[in-house]
Amino acid sequence: MASSAEGDEGTVVALAGVLQSGFQELSLNKLATSLGASEQALRLIISIFLGYPFALFYRHYLFYKETYLIHLFHTFTGLSIAYFNFGNQLYHSLLCIVLQFLILRLMGRTITAVLTTFCFQMAYLLAGYYYTATGNYDIKWTMPHCVLTLKLIGLAVDYFDGGKDQNSLSSEQQKYAIRGVPSLLEVAGFSYFYGAFLVGPQFSMNHYMKLVQGELIDIPGKIPNSIIPALKRLSLGLFYLVGYTLLSPHITEDYLLTEDYDNHPFWFRCMYMLIWGKFVLYKYVTCWLVTEGVCILTGLGFNGFEEKGKAKWDACANMKVWLFETNPRFTGTIASFNINTNAWVARYIFKRLKFLGNKELSQGLSLLFLALWHGLHSGYLVCFQMEFLIVIVERQAARLIQESPTLSKLAAITVLQPFYYLVQQTIHWLFMGYSMTAFCLFTWDKWLKVYKSIYFLGHIFFLSLLFILPYIHKAMVPRKEKLKKME
């Protein structure tokens, strides 16, 4: 009788669990449908916003507490977010973190450990891309794993630098070099920190340890006075979120593949690509602004003080919104968008390739790494190839205008400044959209179809300028200017 009752009770509990899970799935799915989003996208947004209650709990109950409690809290909350989004597939991140800890401990501060880390973590990520690849953008475990991959590679390099003589390191390397030996709990807390696990930003182990040890504060002995700065970034993120949610059903990359798009005049196709190219980036802007607010709230965003003594909270800023919205150059967009990832690539890839003795080659290899890091689709390679080409041409054009007396005088005419700005912004966002077309459509058959519809305008325009500008420079820059430059 007792065993029968216990069995019935177990069945009821199991059934209740299944029903609860089913209702949760149903309600989330229904809500996502009503919002015009996928369930995975809704889970992602919920998880990002969960960082705020987690940060408030940390501020009120764990700040200045024992460090192991803080590491446990970060690990538990990060794992919970991973499970909520990806279920049992959280084992991918857990496995890579544990193996990374073993690499550091068993191989020590050696170049072998760095190379092993780079090869293993990148191979695991690329294998994940290969086995989960589809023709569309899907939110799956590889999304946070690409963030984790950079964290763990950076951890290995900083640990390696920590064993070198201080004098042999640059000031930047000294700042990030890890002198101590991280424990497994510290590595887990660093990796799973809820404010950055899903979509970034990137930050170093040293910066994370300063947070845990209560050093990232603007007033000694008190909780960071960061609520207002955090709310400002949250509000800005919500503004972009609302705008993106309202407009996303009307401005889609799928429309680029339709016959209706092909049947419109050439100018319309270009203008749609321009508007879509700007708009499509707003989903990334939204996520990064919201997560930056979480980082600021915890104190991780603390970045010292300004000259006037005002605290700076931009250590985890992934966006410079004003620069992003107003700068008419491609290099301005690069400097204002995904800042921490770009800084990571500059610190751990570009500057480490200095031995090649060729800045363009180092930049090209860095962009190749970024393309592979994003995924195996051909569209990523095309996008970053276009970025490389555009930046080179933009620098050539800027140098020509600066060194040519005629063009310098024309550029300085005040009344023409608004016209110049409009032309620059039009070129800027048209070809940003052109590059993003390959990035967002992934597969060669899709982006090739769209590029054909606008006659490969971006490639023809910038490749032509790449070869023509040196001759224009030769014709328009006086010889004395060239000699002065050589001196």
Swiss-Prot record:
How is the activity of this chain controlled? Answer: Activity is inhibited by thimerosal.
Q: Kindly list the places in or outside the cell where this protein is found, as annotated in its UniProt entry.
A: Endoplasmic reticulum membrane
Q: Does the keyword Lipid metabolism apply?
A: yes
Pathway membership, UniProt = Lipid metabolism; phospholipid metabolism
Asked if Endoplasmic reticulum is a keyword of the record, the answer is yes
Entry EC no(s): 2.3.1.-, 2.3.1.23, 2.3.1.n7, 2.3.1.n6
Protein's UniProt name: Lysophospholipid acyltransferase 5
Q: Which organism is it from?
A: Homo sapiens
